[in-house]
């Protein structure tokens, strides 16, 4: 056991600091009738009060995050918050760990994906077309310079490089020929 486990689990004389903070922040509106059998187990195993047990069960607020304030000000374990918010046995068993909480947050929050080279974020990354002959080739040739220098270079095999990627980025835009001044002489 960790030396702070007795503090985290709660001593008979007082509730842990994080649970006191939670009790002061948002549990004042909850009443003891919200507790369920799981809350009773919490009270027996962790020696916590009814207010802490209510964290585990919010039956009237199933599936909504509106019952929980912004997570930044709460110092509760993430698994407790996820189980409170989701309140289903399958989700509760999957959301016990910190990593499960982080995975749940990653799906909800949009993130900025910038290019690995640190280039211009507005620049669109060029991708393989997938239909040309080099794109359809599945294995490297093993004889070209890119294949031979696999440890030092990270270039794609010369025989697998897409035809679209071989073209310069500026040539993909069609240029319309600009008429010369002779075409407009009849205006002057």
Curated annotation (Swiss-Prot):
Keyword Amino-acid biosynthesis: no
An MF annotation (GO) of this entry: zinc ion binding
Domains: entry comment: The CXXC zinc finger mediates binding to CpG-DNA.
Chain's gene name: cxxc4
Region spans: Disordered: 1-20
Highest rank taxon of the organism: Eukaryota
Protein name from the UniProt record: CXXC-type zinc finger protein 4
Subcellular location: Cytoplasm
Organism from which the protein derives: Xenopus tropicalis (Western clawed frog)
């Amino acid at each position: 056991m960790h030396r702070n486990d007795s503090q985290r689990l709660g001593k008979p004389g007082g509730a842990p600091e994080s649970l006191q903070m939670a009790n002061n922040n948002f549990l004042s509106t909850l009443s003891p009738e919200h507790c369920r059998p799981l809350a009773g187990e919490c009270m027996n195993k962790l020696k916590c009060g009814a207010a802490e047990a209510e964290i585990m069960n919010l039956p009237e607020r199933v599936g909504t995050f509106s019952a929980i304030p912004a997570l930044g000000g709460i110092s509760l374990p993430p698994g407790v918050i996820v189980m409170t918010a989701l309140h289903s046995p399958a989700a509760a068993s999957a959301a016990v760990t910190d990593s499960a909480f982080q995975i749940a947050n990653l799906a909800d929050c949009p993130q900025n994906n910038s290019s690995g080279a640190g280039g211009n974020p507005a620049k669109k990354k060029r991708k393989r077309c997938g239909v040309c002959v080099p794109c359809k080739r599945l294995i490297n040739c093993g004889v070209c310079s890119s294949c031979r220098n696999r440890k030092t270079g990270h270039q794609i095999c010369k025989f697998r490089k897409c035809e679209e990627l071989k073209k310069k980025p500026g040539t993909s835009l069609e240029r319309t020929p600009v008429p010369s001044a002779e075409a407009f002489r009849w205006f002057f």
